[in-house]
Amino acid sequence: MDARRDGWQVNHKKIQRLWAEEGLRVVVKRRRKRIGVSTVPEIAAEKANDVWSVDFQFDSTITGKPVKILSIVDEHTRECLGGIVDYSITGLDLAEQLDVLAIDRGMPQALRMDNGPELISNAVAKWASETDRVFIPPGQPWRNGFVESFIGKLRDECLNVNQFYSLNHAKGIIGIWKEEYNTIRPHSSLGCSTPSVYAGQCTH
């Protein structure tokens, strides 16, 4: 029976409390996550430089200063190509980092990225206009599976087990971890090769 339809003043929180007191199941409507729409079709990473994934993490120093961590991963070779560790990272910072990587490795076919404010800045949009951008819808981090796996390892194996006394200390520790990830850690998906070794063997 709809109490509102019959003219009753209804307080939904009070009704939920009364239902709970009577042992009745309270159904709570949850907001659906907003799902965005990719601006270009999904592109499979079938060779090196097909798709670079970009994402951010956050940590802090022992004094409470926030630290931003940018990671760029090649989805095919699993290499961590580069990144930035700083108190703040702008779209221009990211564009400059991508320029450096493009000069060293060549341009990627696609740039898979989160829709964060840094990534939609004018500087990034201008750079990404030269590639086929692939946007990951907000609230759907699993769509960016390769870089999400990488930053999960970075979180569990580096950020969660280290205290950073300064920004430079954070840069050093994170840099060492990324180097070991690329050169020492074998990946089953790469035939138990390290990302660096596999990248050197890629001819397709």
Regions flagged by a language model, labelled:
Residues M1-H204:
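Charged DNA-binding/catalytic regions of mobile-element recombinases
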